């Protein structure tokens, strides 16, 4: 976006340079642009600036659980005695202001663990894993606000969100009270997944219609086959009824008549 705005500005400057001078006004003095005389910007420049401001999204605000920058790192706090009495320059070096992003995320995770989990040292519980994923997701979101085309971080962000959804579902089924507390402290809203979701494609619809048509044709053929069998059985039964049951009894009668 910055590159596009810069190109628009450069094109406007090139047009202003190549534009022919305005003929002299009354009084013999050469006239400059009306916008330059009035102290206004050219309309194309204003349009480019407004378009850039409309496209640019606001930066995500900081979270409420953000640790203060003047706080000291825990490792240094335990090692150095009387850390409050050291020089201001040393305090700034040992504070979170000069700490790395990894240390800040670690401190943020520890704060949330102390607030939610009963045993902060146990990182294998479901709520502890959800806290770690939430801190990671917020870090990815802040990164994506600055670098929107970073596909690797976007993939990790979506994978972390799916993993957190799965853990929240399991925690909701096992311990609902802890689930409510975790969602409230983290500011996470859990939505129930639909019972059945399948994205409909044209290929799927065509295949389903073909399967239904084949099933109907098979049922029709089976019905015809059953009808033919019934007709053959009926014809056979009628034929058997027309023939005498004991033909050996009928032969002596004919001989006696002769």
From Swiss-Prot:
GO MF term set = structural constituent of ribosome
The UniProt keywords, alphabetically, are: Mitochondrion, Ribonucleoprotein, Ribosomal protein, Transit peptide
GO biological process, alphabetically ordered: mitochondrial translation
Do the record's keywords include Mitochondrion?
yes
Q: Name one Pfam family in it.
A: Ribosomal_S15
The compartments listed are: Mitochondrion matrix
The transit peptide extends across 1-57
Segments carrying the region annotation (Disordered) are: 229-258
Q: Does this UniProt record's set of keywords contain Ribonucleoprotein? A: yes
Q: Which GO terms describe its cellular component?
A: mitochondrial inner membrane; mitochondrial ribosome; mitochondrial small ribosomal subunit; mitochondrion; nucleolus; nucleoplasm
Q: Which SMART domains match?
A: Ribosomal_S15
Q: Which family does it belong to?
A: Belongs to the universal ribosomal protein uS15 family.
Quaternary structure (record): Component of the mitochondrial ribosome small subunit (28S) which comprises a 12S rRNA and about 30 distinct proteins. Interacts with METTL17.
Q: Which HAMAP family match?
A: Ribosomal_uS15_B
Q: What protein am I looking at?
A: Small ribosomal subunit protein uS15m
Q: Which organism is it from?
A: Mus musculus
């Amino acid at each position: 976006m910055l590159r596009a705005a810069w190109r628009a500005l450069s094109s406007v400057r090139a047009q202003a340079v190549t534009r022919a001078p305005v003929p002299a006004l009354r009084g013999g003095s050469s006239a400059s642009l009306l916008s330059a005389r009035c102290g206004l910007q050219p309309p194309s420049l204003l349009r480019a600036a407004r378009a850039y401001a409309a496209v640019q999204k606001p930066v995500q605000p900081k979270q409420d659980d953000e640790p203060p920058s003047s706080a000291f790192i825990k490792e240094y706090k335990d090692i150095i005695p009387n850390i409050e009495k050291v020089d201001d320059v040393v305090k700034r070096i040992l504070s979170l202001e000069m700490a790395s992003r990894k240390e800040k995320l670690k401190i943020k995770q520890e704060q949330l663990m102390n607030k939610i989990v009963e045993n902060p040292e146990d990182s294998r519980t479901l709520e502890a894993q959800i806290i770690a994923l939430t801190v990671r997701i917020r870090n990815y979101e802040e990164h994506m606000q600055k670098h929107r085309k970073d596909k690797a971080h976007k993939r990790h962000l979506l994978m972390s969100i799916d993993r957190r959804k799965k853990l929240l579902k399991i925690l909701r089924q096992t311990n609902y009270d802890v689930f409510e507390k975790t969602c409230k402290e983290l500011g996470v809203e859990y939505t129930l997944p639909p019972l059945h979701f399948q994205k409909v494609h044209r290929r799927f619809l065509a295949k389903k219609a073909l399967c239904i048509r084949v099933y109907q044709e098979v049922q029709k053929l089976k019905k015809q086959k059953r009808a033919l069998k019934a007709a053959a059985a009926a014809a056979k039964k009628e034929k058997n009824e027309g023939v005498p049951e004991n033909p050996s009894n009928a032969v002596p009668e004919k001989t006696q008549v002769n």
